[in-house]
Each structure stands twice: as structure tokens, then as C-alpha cells.
Swiss-Prot record:
NCBIfam families: HI0507. It holds the Pfam family UPF0114. The chain crosses the membrane at residues 15-35, 53-73, 136-156. This is UPF0114 protein PSPA7_5214. Its main location: membrane. Belongs to the UPF0114 family.
């Protein structure tokens, strides 16, 4: 009976596989939105103000960071919790494959969230004249919460590894 439960629990990790595959669909949706934004900008590129172009570029950078975060969570999550990836020898292999445990994944996710939040905050500051002061304050507080959380997670991870 015990063996059955242990085997069933171990096999249940495969329930995560469709979730990680679903993240690849989210990446596809993000890619579509990325190119939709580019196709929207191209006809207006010469008429756009520099500040507006910078806002669009920050939005594209934001999407690229989110895409990288999705890939990192998909691949390393699959490797850590479901099964090791078997990449053919002749194919290009990401240098961090097999090296990122759940602790380092959490730190990378936290760092990515801080980077994404920084880009978002920069976009807000570019349009600060149209944003009420109390909203700006809350954006900064939320961003600092992300920064402090990422710092604390990294510090705790470093302390537990040594």
C-alpha cells in the first residue's frame, strides 16, 4: 500500500508537464503581441515624438523580459520537477540547463520581476505629469517591495548554501 502511494505521488509530477506546455502557449501569445506592437509603430515611426517611441521601446523590452522569464520557468521548472531534458548532442544547448535548482530559479525569477518592475516604473515616470502623486508613490513602494524581497531571497539563499 505504501509503495503504491509513493509511486502514485512520484508519478503525479507529470501533471505539471501540461502546465509548462501551457506556458509555451503564453509565450506564443506574448510573441504575437510583441509583433503587433511593432506593426502598429512602423507606419507612425516618422510622426512619433521621441518620448512616445521610447515608451514603445520600453514596452517591447518589458515583453522580452517577460518572455525570458517564461522560458526560464518553463524549462528549469520542467527539469527540476518533472524530468530531465534530453537534448540531442548535435543541437544547441542552453548553458544553464541542468544547473538551475529551485533556489536559484526563485532568485532569477525575483531578479526578472525587479527588472520588469523597473521598466514599468520607468514608463510611468516618462509620463509622470499625467499620473497623480499618490499613485506614483504607490508604484515606487510596490517596486521597492519587489527589490527588497529579491534582495532578502538572495541573502537567505546565500546564507543557507554556506
Amino acid at each position: 500500500m505504501e509503495r503504491f502511494f509513493e509511486n502514485a505521488m512520484y508519478a503525479s509530477r507529470w501533471l505539471l508537464a501540461p502546465i509548462y506546455m501551457g506556458l509555451s502557449l503564453a509565450l506564443l501569445a506574448l510573441t504575437i503581441k510583441f509583433f503587433q506592437e511593432i506593426f502598429h509603430v512602423i507606419p507612425n515611426i516618422f510622426a512619433m515624438a521621441e518620448a512616445d517611441l521610447i515608451l514603445v521601446l520600453l514596452s517591447l523590452i518589458d515583453m522580452a523580459l517577460v518572455g525570458g522569464l517564461l522560458v526560464m520557468v518553463m524549462i528549469s521548472g520542467y527539469e527540476n520537477f518533472v524530468s530531465q531534458l534530453d537534448i540531442d548532442e548535435g543541437k544547441e544547448k542552453l548553458n544553464w540547463l541542468g544547473k538551475m535548482d529551485s533556489g536559484s530559479l526563485k532568485n532569477k525569477v525575483a531578479a526578472s520581476i525587479v527588472a520588469i518592475s523597473s521598466i514599468h516604473l520607468l514608463r510611468i515616470f516618462m509620463d509622470a505629469k499625467n499620473v497623480p502623486d499618490n499613485k506614483l508613490m504607490w508604484y515606487v513602494i510596490i517596486h521597492m517591495t519587489f527589490v527588497l524581497s529579491a534582495f532578502a531571497m538572495g541573502y537567505l539563499d546565500k546564507q543557507t548554501r554556506h
